[in-house]
């Protein structure tokens, strides 16, 4: 039975989670180092499937390796098959009505508590899992699995509260108009990536917050950190069945979900190719569904920095190094191509070569390493092929890096390529690694670069303009209006903060539903309009019907 709501509640003020800097000698650094040491000593962990609150061990397992030490297993996770996926769907649908009926502020309280558990009790553990399992250094883990995860959970609560207050602005005499924001009919399939622990949590939590039930398939290379999130949700009071944790082979799990009559939505972050294939499968199955599914996806990018002749090279170079090489270039938003005017090229090249040479690459336990390893062997091989292509081409020159070694971990040195043409292979294709390609253009052709940027890739995720000249800033902002969903002025193209810069792009980069904003939550509700009349009518005819 639903609980009567006897007051209109209001959330506490929501602020971005403060980030620890893990400076030498700090207690935070000591705690994180201890968490890393403990986790390494206890690994490998066993990760079950979780359906209806029950931990299921199938005996069929896969290993999540540590990218910086590919002989070390962080966890062995049990994998689901189509039958278990069907069980997860059935259990989610069985939990749906009670979850949907739970008073809104009780749902909010669960996710607000989850955020506090991440912030305090489990901060170091989930950061350590992200470092060991996904190859992030301490700072990159902190801004992801601690700060951004907390921000997603808390700001979504605030956005949901704001969303529910949106009501019709007008009522006729004797009429009360109102709308309610119903959960979708059916279940949401969340398919999450390896590169952000926080995104995994958000893909499951955002639709669940709005009263939906979720089948969550985590990426194999992020299973352990995502499993910790699932356990945090449970500790925070999330009822069994609301989020079903179903690791395993994508074709079997996703295939079973997309073929189900009650499939209501796909919440996806991953590659453009996979997203397109899933959308195509939804189209093929459209006749099976109870309702038209909501498809929400954030996918690939070929993100750019456009440098104007008025830019300050001492700003351009450090911003570009961070954008290209943080987390080994494995952010959806990472810098992958630069357009540099010829009048600045000599100075930028000198600075860039000198600074990139200072980047340390190595194990996550050494906090002085700016970069660690790429995620797995497949990624390593793909990136290495792009580097080898540039090495063998007469149309390109490698001025930094260009070496790689997977004998211990999947290590690739930060690599800078200079291409003779803006349509060179590494200027146009997504690499998803620590490789940035530069095209040096005649400074008089600045505005011509707008079309080049837009026409040479299918993506439109992030981009930046660097210029002191305000006319150039304005011109580029207008000329590149559709080239990036997140556009930066004199700042790097990475680092969107929840509650400050809603994130997402269009074209081949996704549906641009803007994670970290109220826009995303609208995708997981179905609006019902209610009109209530208080006055009776005197008859059925209208004045125009009378003589």
Predicted regions and their residues:
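Hydrophobic face of amphipathic alpha-helices that form TPR/SEL1-like repeat modules
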Residues: 1-74
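Conserved C-terminal structural/oligomerization subdomain of aldehyde/semialdehyde dehydrogenase
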Residues: 2-12, 17, 21, 68-80, ...
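Residue-level signal for inorganic ion chemistry
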Residues: 71, 107, 130, 211, ...
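Long amphipathic alpha-helix in the N-terminal Rossmann-like dinucleotide-binding domain
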Residues: 82-93, 97-98, 108-124, 134-165, ...
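Generic, well-ordered alpha-helical scaffold segments in large soluble proteins
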Residues: 91-98, 113-117, 121, 129, ...
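Rossmann-like NAD(P) dinucleotide-binding subdomain of oxidoreductase/dehydrogenase enzymes
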Residues: 131, 150, 158-315, 512
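Conserved residues at the C-terminal ends of beta-strands
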Residues: 159, 191, 249, 269, ...
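ALDH superfamily catalytic-core signature
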Residues: 232-237, 259-261, 265, 273-422, ...
